[in-house]
Amino acid sequence: MENFDKVKDIIVDRLGVDADKVTEDASFKDDLGADSLDIAELVMELEDEFGTEIPDEEAEKINTVGDAVNFINNLEK
């Protein structure tokens, strides 16, 4: 499974949004209705799923689904 698909599944599960709304350009706050607590929980779930730690200063830069996917992809390089 591609990283985008894994991230998308986590977002759909955690936020209860329609999978069609989860695109790389989708903003967690503006498009998916996430608040800061939702985003913190998403970051923790991504850390668990991908076996990594996302520093707070990096987590603050994750505003869109694409940001999250790019962060994960860069870890794997």
UniProtKB/Swiss-Prot annotation:
4'-phosphopantetheine is transferred from CoA to a specific serine of apo-ACP by AcpS. This modification is essential for activity because fatty acids are bound in thioester linkage to the sulfhydryl of the prosthetic group. Pathway: Lipid metabolism; fatty acid biosynthesis. PROSITE patterns: CARRIER (PS50075), PHOSPHOPANTETHEINE (PS00012). It holds the Pfam family PP-binding. Residues 1-76 form the Carrier domain. It is found in: Cytoplasm. GO terms for biological process: lipid A biosynthetic process. InterPro entries: ACP, ACP-like_sf, PP-bd_ACP, Ppantetheine_attach_site. One of its GO terms (cellular component) is membrane. The keyword Lipid biosynthesis applies. The modification O-(pantetheine 4'-phosphoryl)serine is found at S36. GO terms for molecular function: acyl binding; acyl carrier activity. Keywords: Cytoplasm, Fatty acid biosynthesis, Fatty acid metabolism, Lipid biosynthesis, Lipid metabolism, Phosphopantetheine, Phosphoprotein. Carrier of the growing fatty acid chain in fatty acid biosynthesis. Belongs to the acyl carrier protein (ACP) family. HAMAP family: Acyl_carrier. This is Acyl carrier protein.
